[in-house]
């Protein structure tokens, strides 16, 4: 009996590993294209809020919130990349332009945060004096208010405590506030050299800064420009 169960457990374990693995793209000629790269700049992230927006917020207020999160994502990605940059096994082969320097150069050239989202990647790289740029695209699809999400969460707990939940399953996604879709691209000469993407649902009890850390930590961990340390 135990021998018959073993293959099933192994299959489930392998499926679990594949479901947890992160799939990202790296260009086949990445090493060739980046051989002479020295400096990389992180651009302000393009952040858009879609779905049911709060009635108390004007379009202008929503736009300002998008731009604030744009900068938050920019700084958070820098921190994440640096946190994962040099390990016992790997070293990072490029330097990163300071975020303040990037923003000052854009401002000096009359390029706002929002304007930078639509500027040509190659032109921005030349303007910033870097070999490649990193772009993030974040879309936050809102389904309900935090208050409504909280109410659904409480109702779900009541259902489970009464025992009804075991007979009538309640999907965990019912009370979600947002679906977040994120992508991160490394671009040089208008070519995508590396890409990673991320999707996650959140509800009322997850703070925005936590979501930003989740996403950027994933991108930072998988970011390229790494080579194995040479043994001494």
Predicted features and spans:
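Sec-dependent bacterial lipoprotein signal peptides
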Residues: 1-20
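Contiguous N-terminal and early-domain "leader" segments and peripheral loops that mark the onset or edge
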Residues: 2-3, 20, 40-41, 59-65, ...
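A generic structural signal for short, solvent-exposed coil/turn residues
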Residues: 9-12, 32-34, 85, 176
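N-terminal start-of-chain detector that recognizes signal peptides
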Residues: 12-16, 104-108, 153-158
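C-terminal/domain-edge helix-coil "capping" segments
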Residues: 20-50, 127, 140-232
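N-terminal segment of the mature soluble domain
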Residues: 48, 52-135, 139-142, 189-198
